[in-house]
Swiss-Prot record:
Catalyzes the attachment of glutamate to tRNA(Glu) in a two-step reaction: glutamate is first activated by ATP to form Glu-AMP and then transferred to the acceptor end of tRNA(Glu). HAMAP family: Glu_tRNA_synth_type1. Keywords: Aminoacyl-tRNA synthetase, ATP-binding, Cytoplasm, Ligase, Nucleotide-binding, Protein biosynthesis. It comes from the Bacteria. One of its GO terms (cellular component) is cytosol. Belongs to the class-I aminoacyl-tRNA synthetase family. Glutamate--tRNA ligase type 1 subfamily. This is Glutamate--tRNA ligase 2. Monomer.
Amino acid sequence: MSEVRVRFAPSPTGSLHIGGARTALFNWLFARHNGGKFILRVDDTDLQRSTEESMKGILEGLKWLGIDWDEGPIYQSQRLEEYRKFANKLLKEGKAYYCFCTKEELEEMRKQAEKEGRPPMYTGKCRNLTKEQIEEYLRQGKKPVIRLKVPQQGKTVVHDIIRGDVEFDNSTFDDFIIMKSDNMPTYNFATVVDDYQMGITHVIRAEEHLSNTPKQILIFEALGLEIPQFAHVSMVLAPDRSKLSKRHGATSVQEFRDQGYLPEAIVNYITLLGWIPKDGEEIFDVSKSKKEFTLERVSKNPAIYDVQKLTWINGHYIRNYDLDKLTEVVIPFLKAKNFIGEDFDYDYIKKIVSVVREREKTLVDVADAMSYYFTEVYEYEEKGVKKYFTKEKVVDILKKAVVTLKEVEPFNKFTTEEAYRKLVEELQISSGELFHPTRLAISGRTFGPGLFDIMELLGKERTIERIEKAIDFIQKMRK
Protein backbone atom coordinates (compact mmCIF):
# COMPACT_ATOMS: atom_id res chain seq x y z
CA MET A 1 0.00 0.00 0.00
CA SER A 2 1.26 3.50 -0.83
CA GLU A 3 1.71 5.94 2.03
CA VAL A 4 -1.55 6.50 3.90
CA ARG A 5 -2.62 10.16 3.89
CA VAL A 6 -5.72 11.22 5.78
CA ARG A 7 -7.17 14.57 6.78
CA PHE A 8 -9.39 16.22 9.34
CA ALA A 9 -11.18 19.21 7.83
CA PRO A 10 -13.18 21.18 10.41
CA SER A 11 -15.19 24.30 9.63
CA PRO A 12 -14.25 27.11 12.06
CA THR A 13 -17.87 28.04 12.70
CA GLY A 14 -18.17 26.65 16.23
CA SER A 15 -16.54 24.51 18.90
CA LEU A 16 -14.76 21.19 18.53
CA HIS A 17 -17.52 18.80 19.58
CA ILE A 18 -17.30 15.20 20.62
CA GLY A 19 -18.30 13.95 17.14
CA GLY A 20 -15.66 16.07 15.40
CA ALA A 21 -13.04 15.09 17.97
CA ARG A 22 -13.81 11.42 17.30
CA THR A 23 -13.48 11.94 13.53
CA ALA A 24 -10.11 13.63 14.06
CA LEU A 25 -9.01 10.86 16.43
CA PHE A 26 -10.01 8.01 14.08
CA ASN A 27 -8.12 9.66 11.21
CA TRP A 28 -5.10 10.24 13.45
CA LEU A 29 -5.13 6.66 14.80
CA PHE A 30 -5.42 5.27 11.25
CA ALA A 31 -2.47 7.38 10.10
CA ARG A 32 -0.32 6.48 13.10
CA HIS A 33 -1.21 2.76 12.86
CA ASN A 34 -0.18 2.71 9.19
CA GLY A 35 2.87 4.96 9.48
CA GLY A 36 1.10 7.57 7.34
CA LYS A 37 0.43 11.30 7.47
CA PHE A 38 -2.37 13.19 9.24
CA ILE A 39 -3.20 16.52 7.56
CA LEU A 40 -5.17 19.34 9.15
CA ARG A 41 -7.24 21.29 6.64
CA VAL A 42 -9.58 24.15 7.45
CA ASP A 43 -12.84 24.36 5.47
CA ASP A 44 -13.27 28.11 5.90
CA THR A 45 -14.88 29.11 2.61
CA ASP A 46 -17.99 30.20 4.54
CA LEU A 47 -16.34 33.52 5.29
CA GLN A 48 -19.37 35.02 7.04
CA ARG A 49 -19.64 32.27 9.66
CA SER A 50 -15.96 31.36 10.05
CA THR A 51 -14.19 32.99 12.98
CA GLU A 52 -10.61 33.11 14.24
CA GLU A 53 -11.89 32.37 17.74
CA SER A 54 -13.48 29.09 16.59
CA MET A 55 -10.32 28.09 14.76
CA LYS A 56 -8.18 28.84 17.80
CA GLY A 57 -10.51 26.72 19.94
CA ILE A 58 -10.35 23.79 17.50
CA LEU A 59 -6.53 23.89 17.35
CA GLU A 60 -6.25 24.11 21.14
CA GLY A 61 -8.73 21.26 21.55
CA LEU A 62 -6.77 18.97 19.22
CA LYS A 63 -3.48 19.82 20.94
CA TRP A 64 -5.01 19.22 24.38
CA LEU A 65 -6.21 15.78 23.24
CA GLY A 66 -2.71 14.99 21.98
CA ILE A 67 -3.79 14.84 18.31
CA ASP A 68 -0.83 16.27 16.41
CA TRP A 69 -0.74 16.87 12.66
CA ASP A 70 2.03 16.33 10.12
CA GLU A 71 0.94 19.01 7.63
CA GLY A 72 -1.19 22.13 7.98
CA PRO A 73 -3.29 23.81 8.98
CA ILE A 74 -4.10 24.44 5.31
CA TYR A 75 -6.86 27.03 4.79
CA GLN A 76 -9.28 26.66 1.87
CA SER A 77 -9.78 30.44 1.79
CA GLN A 78 -6.14 30.75 0.69
CA ARG A 79 -6.57 28.28 -2.20
CA LEU A 80 -9.34 29.93 -4.22
CA GLU A 81 -7.24 30.14 -7.40
CA GLU A 82 -6.80 26.36 -7.35
CA TYR A 83 -10.56 25.76 -7.33
CA ARG A 84 -11.09 28.25 -10.17
CA LYS A 85 -8.36 26.53 -12.19
CA PHE A 86 -10.06 23.13 -11.89
CA ALA A 87 -13.50 24.61 -12.60
CA ASN A 88 -12.13 26.21 -15.78
CA LYS A 89 -10.70 22.83 -16.82
CA LEU A 90 -14.18 21.30 -16.57
CA LEU A 91 -15.70 24.22 -18.52
CA LYS A 92 -13.09 23.86 -21.24
CA GLU A 93 -13.73 20.12 -21.55
CA GLY A 94 -17.52 20.59 -21.68
CA LYS A 95 -18.03 18.72 -18.40
CA ALA A 96 -19.42 21.77 -16.63
CA TYR A 97 -21.29 24.86 -17.76
CA TYR A 98 -22.24 28.40 -16.80
CA CYS A 99 -25.74 28.80 -15.41
CA PHE A 100 -27.34 32.27 -15.45
CA CYS A 101 -30.72 31.29 -13.99
CA THR A 102 -32.10 33.84 -11.54
CA LYS A 103 -33.52 33.10 -8.08
CA GLU A 104 -36.98 33.68 -9.52
CA GLU A 105 -36.43 31.14 -12.31
CA LEU A 106 -35.12 28.56 -9.85
CA GLU A 107 -38.12 29.16 -7.58
CA GLU A 108 -40.46 28.65 -10.55
CA MET A 109 -38.72 25.31 -11.33
CA ARG A 110 -39.19 24.25 -7.69
CA LYS A 111 -42.91 25.11 -7.75
CA GLN A 112 -43.45 23.30 -11.04
CA ALA A 113 -41.73 20.17 -9.70
CA GLU A 114 -43.88 20.33 -6.58
CA LYS A 115 -47.01 20.64 -8.71
CA GLU A 116 -45.98 17.57 -10.74
CA GLY A 117 -45.04 15.58 -7.62
CA ARG A 118 -41.35 15.48 -8.52
CA PRO A 119 -38.42 16.23 -6.19
CA PRO A 120 -37.22 19.82 -6.75
CA MET A 121 -34.30 19.65 -9.18
CA TYR A 122 -32.59 22.00 -11.58
CA THR A 123 -33.99 21.36 -15.06
CA GLY A 124 -30.74 21.88 -16.96
CA LYS A 125 -32.06 25.02 -18.65
CA CYS A 126 -28.56 26.46 -19.24
CA ARG A 127 -26.90 23.12 -20.06
CA ASN A 128 -26.75 23.74 -23.79
CA LEU A 129 -26.29 27.51 -24.09
CA THR A 130 -24.33 28.55 -27.17
CA LYS A 131 -21.00 30.33 -26.92
CA GLU A 132 -22.72 33.49 -28.20
CA GLN A 133 -25.47 33.33 -25.57
CA ILE A 134 -22.89 32.93 -22.81
CA GLU A 135 -20.85 35.89 -24.09
CA GLU A 136 -23.98 38.05 -24.28
CA TYR A 137 -25.01 37.22 -20.69
CA LEU A 138 -21.49 37.96 -19.46
CA ARG A 139 -21.46 41.26 -21.42
CA GLN A 140 -24.68 42.21 -19.64
CA GLY A 141 -22.85 41.79 -16.31
CA LYS A 142 -24.72 38.67 -15.25
CA LYS A 143 -22.77 36.59 -12.72
CA PRO A 144 -23.17 32.88 -13.38
CA VAL A 145 -22.70 29.84 -11.20
CA ILE A 146 -20.88 26.83 -12.64
CA ARG A 147 -22.74 23.50 -12.66
CA LEU A 148 -21.36 20.02 -13.23
CA LYS A 149 -22.89 18.02 -16.09
CA VAL A 150 -24.12 15.00 -14.16
CA PRO A 151 -24.72 11.77 -16.12
CA GLN A 152 -28.49 11.38 -16.27
CA GLN A 153 -28.39 7.59 -16.30
CA GLY A 154 -26.55 4.84 -14.45
CA LYS A 155 -25.47 4.55 -10.83
CA THR A 156 -22.70 5.93 -8.68
CA VAL A 157 -21.36 3.39 -6.19
CA VAL A 158 -19.60 4.35 -2.97
CA HIS A 159 -17.21 1.57 -1.95
CA ASP A 160 -17.21 2.14 1.80
CA ILE A 161 -14.74 0.28 4.02
CA ILE A 162 -17.17 0.30 6.97
CA ARG A 163 -20.56 0.08 5.22
CA GLY A 164 -19.80 -1.92 2.10
CA ASP A 165 -21.10 -0.75 -1.30
CA VAL A 166 -23.75 1.98 -1.23
CA GLU A 167 -25.49 2.72 -4.56
CA PHE A 168 -27.02 6.00 -5.72
CA ASP A 169 -29.08 6.49 -8.89
CA ASN A 170 -27.63 9.34 -10.95
CA SER A 171 -31.19 10.31 -11.88
CA THR A 172 -31.66 11.54 -8.29
CA PHE A 173 -29.04 14.26 -8.80
CA ASP A 174 -29.45 17.44 -10.78
CA ASP A 175 -26.56 19.34 -12.34
CA PHE A 176 -25.32 20.61 -8.99
CA ILE A 177 -23.32 23.80 -8.49
CA ILE A 178 -19.54 23.54 -8.11
CA MET A 179 -18.70 27.28 -8.17
CA LYS A 180 -21.00 29.97 -6.81
CA SER A 181 -21.66 33.32 -8.49
CA ASP A 182 -19.21 35.04 -6.10
CA ASN A 183 -16.43 32.80 -7.47
CA MET A 184 -16.33 30.71 -4.28
CA PRO A 185 -16.32 26.91 -4.53
CA THR A 186 -19.07 24.77 -3.06
CA TYR A 187 -18.16 22.37 -0.26
CA ASN A 188 -18.12 19.28 -2.48
CA PHE A 189 -15.96 20.83 -5.19
CA ALA A 190 -13.38 22.32 -2.82
CA THR A 191 -13.21 18.99 -0.97
CA VAL A 192 -12.42 17.04 -4.14
CA VAL A 193 -9.75 19.48 -5.34
CA ASP A 194 -8.12 19.52 -1.91
CA ASP A 195 -8.22 15.76 -1.45
CA TYR A 196 -6.59 15.31 -4.85
CA GLN A 197 -3.90 17.94 -4.42
CA MET A 198 -3.09 16.77 -0.89
CA GLY A 199 -2.82 13.16 -1.99
CA ILE A 200 -5.51 11.95 0.40
CA THR A 201 -5.78 8.15 0.21
CA HIS A 202 -8.57 7.57 2.75
CA VAL A 203 -11.50 9.85 3.57
CA ILE A 204 -12.67 8.96 7.10
CA ARG A 205 -15.61 11.05 8.24
CA ALA A 206 -19.06 11.04 9.82
CA GLU A 207 -21.96 9.12 8.32
CA GLU A 208 -23.83 12.39 7.71
CA HIS A 209 -21.38 13.05 4.84
CA LEU A 210 -22.33 9.84 3.02
CA SER A 211 -24.92 11.74 0.94
CA ASN A 212 -22.14 14.09 -0.29
CA THR A 213 -19.94 11.22 -1.40
CA PRO A 214 -21.61 10.31 -4.73
CA LYS A 215 -21.42 13.96 -5.79
CA GLN A 216 -17.74 14.02 -4.90
CA ILE A 217 -17.16 10.81 -6.84
CA LEU A 218 -18.89 12.38 -9.88
CA ILE A 219 -16.51 15.36 -9.61
CA PHE A 220 -13.46 13.06 -9.28
CA GLU A 221 -14.61 11.18 -12.38
CA ALA A 222 -15.26 14.36 -14.38
CA LEU A 223 -11.74 15.57 -13.54
CA GLY A 224 -10.27 12.17 -14.38
CA LEU A 225 -8.75 11.80 -10.92
CA GLU A 226 -8.13 8.73 -8.76
CA ILE A 227 -10.88 8.31 -6.17
CA PRO A 228 -9.75 7.86 -2.54
CA GLN A 229 -11.15 5.13 -0.30
CA PHE A 230 -14.09 6.14 1.88
CA ALA A 231 -15.05 5.15 5.41
CA HIS A 232 -18.11 6.70 7.03
CA VAL A 233 -18.27 6.28 10.81
CA SER A 234 -21.61 6.05 12.56
CA MET A 235 -23.34 8.96 14.27
CA VAL A 236 -22.88 9.68 17.98
CA LEU A 237 -26.38 9.72 19.46
CA ALA A 238 -27.77 10.75 22.83
CA PRO A 239 -28.89 8.02 25.29
CA ASP A 240 -32.48 8.37 23.97
CA ARG A 241 -31.05 7.83 20.44
CA SER A 242 -31.87 11.39 19.41
CA LYS A 243 -29.29 13.75 17.91
CA LEU A 244 -26.72 14.78 20.50
CA SER A 245 -27.19 18.40 21.59
CA LYS A 246 -26.55 20.81 24.47
CA ARG A 247 -29.61 19.55 26.33
CA HIS A 248 -27.70 16.31 26.89
CA GLY A 249 -24.97 18.16 28.81
CA ALA A 250 -21.43 18.98 27.75
CA THR A 251 -20.70 18.10 24.13
CA SER A 252 -17.66 20.24 23.27
CA VAL A 253 -14.05 19.43 24.13
CA GLN A 254 -13.66 22.81 25.87
CA GLU A 255 -16.67 22.10 28.11
CA PHE A 256 -15.22 18.75 29.13
CA ARG A 257 -11.91 20.45 29.85
CA ASP A 258 -13.60 23.12 31.98
CA GLN A 259 -15.50 20.44 33.89
CA GLY A 260 -12.31 18.70 34.90
CA TYR A 261 -11.99 15.78 32.52
CA LEU A 262 -8.50 14.57 31.62
CA PRO A 263 -7.51 14.45 27.93
CA GLU A 264 -6.41 10.82 28.20
CA ALA A 265 -9.85 9.87 29.54
CA ILE A 266 -11.63 11.75 26.74
CA VAL A 267 -9.44 10.06 24.10
CA ASN A 268 -10.03 6.64 25.69
CA TYR A 269 -13.80 7.23 25.78
CA ILE A 270 -14.30 8.63 22.28
CA THR A 271 -12.19 5.79 20.85
CA LEU A 272 -14.83 3.46 22.31
CA LEU A 273 -17.56 5.31 20.37
CA GLY A 274 -17.45 2.86 17.50
CA TRP A 275 -14.26 0.86 18.12
CA ILE A 276 -13.00 -1.55 20.77
CA PRO A 277 -9.64 -3.33 21.12
CA LYS A 278 -9.26 -7.04 20.42
CA ASP A 279 -9.29 -8.03 24.09
CA GLY A 280 -12.52 -6.10 24.73
CA GLU A 281 -10.96 -3.99 27.50
CA GLU A 282 -12.54 -0.57 27.99
CA ILE A 283 -9.60 1.15 29.70
CA PHE A 284 -6.56 1.48 27.46
CA ASP A 285 -4.01 4.11 26.58
CA VAL A 286 -3.48 5.60 23.16
CA SER A 287 -0.39 3.49 22.45
CA LYS A 288 -2.62 0.41 22.42
CA SER A 289 -5.23 1.95 20.10
CA LYS A 290 -2.49 3.17 17.72
CA LYS A 291 -1.12 -0.35 17.58
CA GLU A 292 -4.48 -2.05 16.97
CA PHE A 293 -6.69 0.48 15.16
CA THR A 294 -8.21 -0.67 11.86
CA LEU A 295 -11.27 0.58 9.99
CA GLU A 296 -12.52 -3.00 9.64
CA ARG A 297 -13.13 -3.05 13.41
CA VAL A 298 -15.18 0.17 13.38
CA SER A 299 -18.87 -0.51 14.03
CA LYS A 300 -21.64 0.40 11.57
CA ASN A 301 -24.09 0.93 14.43
CA PRO A 302 -24.70 4.34 16.01
CA ALA A 303 -22.54 5.06 19.04
CA ILE A 304 -24.46 6.05 22.19
CA TYR A 305 -22.98 8.88 24.23
CA ASP A 306 -22.95 7.96 27.93
CA VAL A 307 -21.60 10.68 30.23
CA GLN A 308 -21.69 8.32 33.23
CA LYS A 309 -19.32 5.95 31.49
CA LEU A 310 -17.04 8.83 30.51
CA THR A 311 -17.03 10.02 34.13
CA TRP A 312 -16.25 6.50 35.37
CA ILE A 313 -13.31 6.29 32.95
CA ASN A 314 -12.14 9.73 34.06
CA GLY A 315 -12.21 8.59 37.70
CA HIS A 316 -9.98 5.66 36.77
CA TYR A 317 -7.45 8.00 35.16
CA ILE A 318 -7.52 10.38 38.16
CA ARG A 319 -6.74 7.49 40.53
CA ASN A 320 -3.90 6.24 38.35
CA TYR A 321 -2.44 9.51 36.99
CA ASP A 322 1.14 10.49 37.73
CA LEU A 323 0.84 12.44 41.01
CA ASP A 324 2.91 15.42 39.86
CA LYS A 325 0.93 15.69 36.61
CA LEU A 326 -2.35 15.45 38.50
CA THR A 327 -1.24 18.12 40.97
CA GLU A 328 -0.31 20.47 38.11
CA VAL A 329 -3.69 20.11 36.39
CA VAL A 330 -5.63 20.50 39.67
CA ILE A 331 -3.92 23.79 40.58
CA PRO A 332 -5.88 25.94 38.02
CA PHE A 333 -9.14 24.59 39.50
CA LEU A 334 -7.99 25.51 43.02
CA LYS A 335 -7.16 29.02 41.79
CA ALA A 336 -10.53 29.34 40.05
CA LYS A 337 -12.26 28.57 43.36
CA ASN A 338 -9.99 31.07 45.18
CA PHE A 339 -8.65 28.31 47.44
CA ILE A 340 -5.09 29.39 46.57
CA GLY A 341 -3.43 32.43 45.02
CA GLU A 342 -0.27 32.73 42.96
CA ASP A 343 1.91 32.01 45.99
CA PHE A 344 1.21 28.44 47.11
CA ASP A 345 2.96 25.44 48.65
CA TYR A 346 3.20 22.89 45.81
CA ASP A 347 4.33 20.02 48.05
CA TYR A 348 1.44 20.60 50.45
CA ILE A 349 -1.07 20.57 47.57
CA LYS A 350 0.52 17.40 46.21
CA LYS A 351 0.08 15.65 49.58
CA ILE A 352 -3.60 16.61 49.68
CA VAL A 353 -4.17 15.47 46.08
CA SER A 354 -2.63 12.09 46.94
CA VAL A 355 -5.21 11.46 49.69
CA VAL A 356 -8.37 12.90 48.05
CA ARG A 357 -8.08 11.50 44.53
CA GLU A 358 -9.22 7.95 45.33
CA ARG A 359 -12.91 8.86 45.53
CA GLU A 360 -13.19 11.64 42.95
CA LYS A 361 -14.31 11.49 39.30
CA THR A 362 -13.28 14.91 37.88
CA LEU A 363 -10.72 17.61 38.62
CA VAL A 364 -13.58 19.83 39.81
CA ASP A 365 -14.45 17.09 42.32
CA VAL A 366 -10.81 16.87 43.41
CA ALA A 367 -10.66 20.64 43.95
CA ASP A 368 -13.96 20.63 45.87
CA ALA A 369 -12.73 17.77 48.04
CA MET A 370 -9.72 19.92 48.97
CA SER A 371 -11.72 22.96 50.06
CA TYR A 372 -11.48 22.49 53.84
CA TYR A 373 -7.68 22.40 53.70
CA PHE A 374 -7.64 25.98 52.42
CA THR A 375 -10.79 27.54 53.89
CA GLU A 376 -12.39 27.43 57.31
CA VAL A 377 -15.31 25.08 57.94
CA TYR A 378 -18.29 27.42 58.32
CA GLU A 379 -21.03 24.84 58.07
CA TYR A 380 -21.50 21.13 58.56
CA GLU A 381 -23.39 18.63 56.43
CA GLU A 382 -26.95 18.60 57.73
CA LYS A 383 -27.27 14.82 57.72
CA GLY A 384 -24.02 14.60 59.71
CA VAL A 385 -25.23 17.11 62.27
CA LYS A 386 -28.43 15.09 62.82
CA LYS A 387 -26.58 11.79 62.96
CA TYR A 388 -23.49 12.66 65.01
CA PHE A 389 -23.78 16.07 66.69
CA THR A 390 -27.11 15.31 68.39
CA LYS A 391 -25.77 12.31 70.35
CA GLU A 392 -25.89 12.84 74.10
CA LYS A 393 -22.21 12.14 74.87
CA VAL A 394 -20.68 13.79 71.77
CA VAL A 395 -19.51 16.99 73.54
CA ASP A 396 -17.76 15.05 76.30
CA ILE A 397 -16.16 12.72 73.75
CA LEU A 398 -14.88 15.63 71.61
CA LYS A 399 -13.56 17.49 74.69
CA LYS A 400 -11.56 14.40 75.67
CA ALA A 401 -10.35 14.18 72.05
CA VAL A 402 -8.97 17.74 72.31
CA VAL A 403 -7.11 16.89 75.53
CA THR A 404 -5.70 13.75 73.91
CA LEU A 405 -4.59 15.47 70.69
CA LYS A 406 -2.82 18.25 72.60
CA GLU A 407 -0.50 15.59 74.02
CA VAL A 408 0.29 13.95 70.66
CA GLU A 409 3.83 14.63 69.46
CA PRO A 410 4.91 14.31 66.70
CA PHE A 411 1.51 14.95 65.10
CA ASN A 412 1.02 12.64 62.11
CA LYS A 413 -1.46 10.06 60.86
CA PHE A 414 0.19 7.23 62.77
CA THR A 415 0.46 8.95 66.15
CA THR A 416 -3.05 10.45 65.96
CA GLU A 417 -4.57 7.09 65.06
CA GLU A 418 -2.75 5.39 67.93
CA ALA A 419 -3.95 8.09 70.37
CA TYR A 420 -7.55 7.81 69.11
CA ARG A 421 -7.58 4.01 69.37
CA LYS A 422 -6.41 4.25 73.00
CA LEU A 423 -9.08 6.87 73.74
CA VAL A 424 -11.79 4.60 72.32
CA GLU A 425 -10.68 1.83 74.69
CA GLU A 426 -10.40 4.20 77.63
CA LEU A 427 -13.92 5.61 77.10
CA GLN A 428 -15.32 2.16 76.27
CA ILE A 429 -17.11 3.47 73.16
CA SER A 430 -17.21 2.35 69.53
CA SER A 431 -14.63 3.89 67.21
CA GLY A 432 -17.49 5.44 65.21
CA GLU A 433 -18.63 7.46 68.22
CA LEU A 434 -15.29 9.27 68.18
CA PHE A 435 -14.21 9.09 64.53
CA HIS A 436 -17.44 10.26 62.85
CA PRO A 437 -18.02 13.46 64.86
CA THR A 438 -14.31 14.28 64.58
CA ARG A 439 -14.43 13.97 60.79
CA LEU A 440 -17.50 16.22 60.65
CA ALA A 441 -15.85 18.74 62.99
CA ILE A 442 -12.59 19.09 61.04
CA SER A 443 -13.93 18.81 57.47
CA GLY A 444 -17.64 19.67 57.65
CA ARG A 445 -18.31 16.42 55.78
CA THR A 446 -19.34 12.88 56.56
CA PHE A 447 -17.18 11.23 53.88
CA GLY A 448 -13.72 11.78 52.50
CA PRO A 449 -10.15 10.55 52.80
CA GLY A 450 -8.86 8.74 55.88
CA LEU A 451 -9.54 10.72 59.07
CA PHE A 452 -5.92 10.61 60.19
CA ASP A 453 -4.68 11.70 56.76
CA ILE A 454 -6.89 14.77 57.14
CA MET A 455 -5.55 15.45 60.64
CA GLU A 456 -1.93 15.23 59.51
CA LEU A 457 -2.52 17.57 56.57
CA LEU A 458 -4.44 20.11 58.66
CA GLY A 459 -1.82 20.00 61.40
CA LYS A 460 -2.22 19.93 65.15
CA GLU A 461 -3.30 23.53 65.69
CA ARG A 462 -6.02 23.63 63.02
CA THR A 463 -7.34 20.17 63.95
CA ILE A 464 -7.78 21.13 67.61
CA GLU A 465 -9.24 24.56 66.73
CA ARG A 466 -11.87 22.96 64.50
CA ILE A 467 -12.89 20.39 67.09
CA GLU A 468 -13.23 23.16 69.70
CA LYS A 469 -15.29 25.20 67.24
CA ALA A 470 -17.57 22.19 66.66
CA ILE A 471 -18.02 21.75 70.43
CA ASP A 472 -19.09 25.39 70.62
CA PHE A 473 -21.50 24.87 67.68
CA ILE A 474 -23.11 21.82 69.36
CA GLN A 475 -23.51 23.58 72.70
CA LYS A 476 -25.17 26.61 71.06
CA MET A 477 -27.39 24.29 69.03
CA ARG A 478 -28.65 22.66 72.24
CA LYS A 479 -29.63 25.90 73.98
